[in-house]
């Protein structure tokens, strides 16, 4: 009836008003708000190590119980390195190590990848020389990226190598040999001493973020036969931890070197 329609219109009007008031700037604009930004100002507050010299006693007392819990999680040693490892293009000891770990982890998930790829942008810290803690691993791989496995044709793998060349290098596993130019062109590509067969199929271990075609590695969007293992153990930092722990159980230190996987000519 008429009264019902009027009530419904009132309710709808109230709802629209609520959206306008509580929505984002886009919602406000859509509702033709009369308000406009008259001026804007900003300032920069640098929060860095300078504050460590004079810690606030009250704040330190407040976080103390939480700090103990964090330390208990971050300080356990998982292994040792032979030297400090850092990242850098076109290749580095740390990026080589992480790409190799991707391949190494394949057996944990019933996979036999022929190569591994680890994006430089996902490496956020260096590894120290000597003892390495869980916290060190978290600093290197702070994101919840997960290992995954996929297949590319040889033609698409060559496209991937061209994209890696264009970016000046990414983390690639042992057996990959790329020759690139200073301006990011791919000159030659080999895998385990063999030319890439355009008609072949190649199994690759990488991170899910990379497999989605991010970091300008769009060749991964052509992937097939994707295997994304579930579970917490699939997080990249836990995969890295297990590698260190296995080495430690054998009394071995973790070592990685630059070996000419990506050469600029």
Predicted regions and their residues:
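Hard-cation-handling environments
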Residues: 40, 44-126
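Bacterial N-terminal signal peptides that target proteins for export
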Residues: 6-20
